[in-house]
């Protein structure tokens, strides 16, 4: 259920864009992200930092898009969010406090060097997505960018998540691998 809630704003943004335009879709994205926070809090009695940061970015850049009637702001939001994720992961790893390990370390007990590799992989992934977003957003038609944002980045993230799980699984201790089968 929680993962479905994460996709709610994206689905609403895409649907509203297809029926109206980027400006109405930006307003809908702000509303849908606020609704996501409300429902998440009602169901789970807590909010993750990632959701709060995303909501803040959506609200700021969505509002700027609407006020200035300029879709550049909503396009930049994607790159800025991915950049923040890359920076947060990279800094946490440099401080030997892996965010990924703190999130998944109880379920998947692998060596710190494996967590470091996975973390740097995600730093590169998020930074690359941010750069590719800049290219797609400002070199290709708006509709192409919307499709890339909704389908391309989502698919890339899901593929990378699966690859990460397989990589971590490969490095699990034998007894923990047996538990997961």
Curated annotation (Swiss-Prot):
Organism superkingdom: Bacteria
Short name of any one Pfam family annotated for the protein: IspA
Keywords of the record: Cell inner membrane, Cell membrane, Membrane, Transmembrane, Transmembrane helix
One GO CC term, this protein: plasma membrane
Membrane topology: Multi-pass membrane protein
Segments crossing the lipid bilayer: 10-30, 50-70, 80-100, 118-138, 148-168
Major location category of this protein: membrane
Cellular localization per UniProt: Cell inner membrane
Biological role: Plays a role in cell envelope biogenesis, maintenance of cell envelope integrity and membrane homeostasis.
HAMAP family xref list: YciB
Membership in a protein family: Belongs to the YciB family.
UniProt protein name: Inner membrane-spanning protein YciB
Source organism per UniProt: Shewanella baltica (strain OS223)
Organism classification: Bacteria, Pseudomonadati, Pseudomonadota, Gammaproteobacteria, Alteromonadales
Gene from which the chain derives: yciB
């Amino acid at each position: 259920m929680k993962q479905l809630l994460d996709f709610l704003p994206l689905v609403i943004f895409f649907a509203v864009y297809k029926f109206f335009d980027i400006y109405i879709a930006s307003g809908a994205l702000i509303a849908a992200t606020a609704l996501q926070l409300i429902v998440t809090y009602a169901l789970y009695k807590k909010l993750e930092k990632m959701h709060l940061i995303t909501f803040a970015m959506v609200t700021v850049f969505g509002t700027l898009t609407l006020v200035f009637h300029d879709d550049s702001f909503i396009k930049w939001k994607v790159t800025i969010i991915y950049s923040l994720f890359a920076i947060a992961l990279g800094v946490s790893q440099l401080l030997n406090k892996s965010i990924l390990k703190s999130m998944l370390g109880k379920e998947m007990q692998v060596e710190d060097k494996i967590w470091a590799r996975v973390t740097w992989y995600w730093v590169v992934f998020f930074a690359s997505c941010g750069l590719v977003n800049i290219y797609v957003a400002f070199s290709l038609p708006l509709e192409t960018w919307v499709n890339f944002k909704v389908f391309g980045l989502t698919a890339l993230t899901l593929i990378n998540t699966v690859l990460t799980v397989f990589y971590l699984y490969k490095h699990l201790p034998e007894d923990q691998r047996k538990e997961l089968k």
